[in-house]
Swiss-Prot record:
SUPFAM superfamilies: Prokaryotic type KH domain (KH-domain type II), Ribosomal protein S3 C-terminal domain
InterPro entries per record: KH_dom, KH_dom-like_a/b, KH_dom_type_2, KH_sf_prok-type, Ribosomal_S3_C_sf, Ribosomal_uS3_bac-typ, Ribosomal_uS3_C
Stretch forming the signal peptide: none
GO biological process: translation
Species lineage: Bacteria, Pseudomonadati, Thermomicrobiota, Thermomicrobia, Thermomicrobiales
Organism: Thermomicrobium roseum (strain ATCC 27502 / DSM 5159 / P-2)
GO molecular function, one term: rRNA binding
HAMAP family: Ribosomal_uS3_B
Keywords annotated in UniProt: Ribonucleoprotein, Ribosomal protein, RNA-binding, rRNA-binding
UniProt protein name: Small ribosomal subunit protein uS3
Length: 223
């Protein structure tokens, strides 16, 4: 039976870029660096659970790791006089044993970020807010912010029902088969007393041609 491919993985190298950018010469080195990446992401999300972090990009030099944190709340990540970001850098360096540079990149429109939208819906479902209301408000906010289309799916024992079911909220168009379409995608799970509720979000930002790809913006660097 056919399955839908991940929209971000389907467009890597065309519209989207990799979140880990490094090269390993040996299999053992690859395994070690892969586990370091997993540790870095797990530690950042654990230390900053409410910082509105969408994604974490990792690049490597010889004895240095550059970590870019994309967040909707840069003030929470940086902290008063940089206290939080300095503490996070020290924790990362003690965990992986290498020098770490932190780059904080602000997400100016969180309504257009699929990960943040999915987390917001999941949090509302956990707090027993109506899932239909949360979906409609999230889709409307994304369209007001400039999205070309939004698709939201929640699945599970909605409202405590005996059998699981699936509910969709679709606004505009989301062309999943168009490779040049810039589609953001995220999956989040909402824990409830009835079990896990799955939340999927697709946000269509329009088509992106190779010459029109946005440049990488610089952020705040902590060394």
């Amino acid at each position: 039976m056919g399955r839908k491919v991940n929209p971000i993985g389907f467009r890597l190298g065309i519209v989207h870029d990799w979140e880990s950018k490094w090269f390993a010469e040996k299999d053992r080195q690859y395994r070690e660096q892969l586990h370091e990446d997993l540790d870095i992401r797990e530690l950042v999300h654990r230390e900053l659970p409410r910082a509105g972090i969408s994604r974490i990009e990792i690049q490597r030099a010889v004895n240095r790791v550059d970590v870019t944190i994309h967040t909707a709340k840069p003030g929470v990540v940086i902290g008063k006089q940089g206290a939080n970001v300095e503490r996070l850098r020290q924790l990362l360096e003690s965990r992986i044993g290498k020098k770490v540079h932190l780059n904080i990149q602000e997400i100016r429109k969180p309504e257009l970020d699929a990960r943040l939208v999915a987390e917001s819906i999941a949090e509302q479902i956990t707090r027993r807010v109506s899932y239909r209301r949360a979906m409609k408000h999230a889709a409307a906010a994304a369209m007001r912010a400039g999205a070309k289309g939004v698709k939201i799916r929640v699945k599970g024992r909605l409202g405590g029902a005996e059998m699981k079911r699936m509910v969709w909220e679709i606004v505009g168009r989301v062309p999943l088969n168009t490779i040049r379409a810039n589609i953001d995608y995220a999956v989040v799970h909402a824990p409830t007393i009835y079990g896990q509720i799955g939340v999927k979000v697709w946000i269509y930002h329009g088509d992106v041609l190779p010459e029109a790809r946005p440049p990488i913006a610089a952020g705040v660097v902590a060394e």
